[in-house]
Amino acid sequence: MPQSSRYSDEHVEQLLSELVSVLEKHRTPTDLSLMVLGNMVTNLINTSIAPAQRKVLARSFAEALQASVREDKAH
């Protein structure tokens, strides 16, 4: 069952589009894009989340990421 969000699809899509535009503007290869985005997630967790909740949130984020990755052969 999809999770509901307090953020509109339009807002999420706008932010995603802007982030992708920055990466494309710099012709960022996939591995560097993943490194930068991973560092951004780590920074957000370490600076915005209470220490006692960081590991739980990181685990939840990792599980959500794994659940959203498709296994089809398209790329």
From Swiss-Prot:
It holds the Pfam family DUF1414. InterPro entries: UPF0352, YejL_sf. It comes from the Bacteria. Belongs to the UPF0352 family. This is UPF0352 protein YPO1261/y2923/YP_0880. It comes from Yersinia pestis.
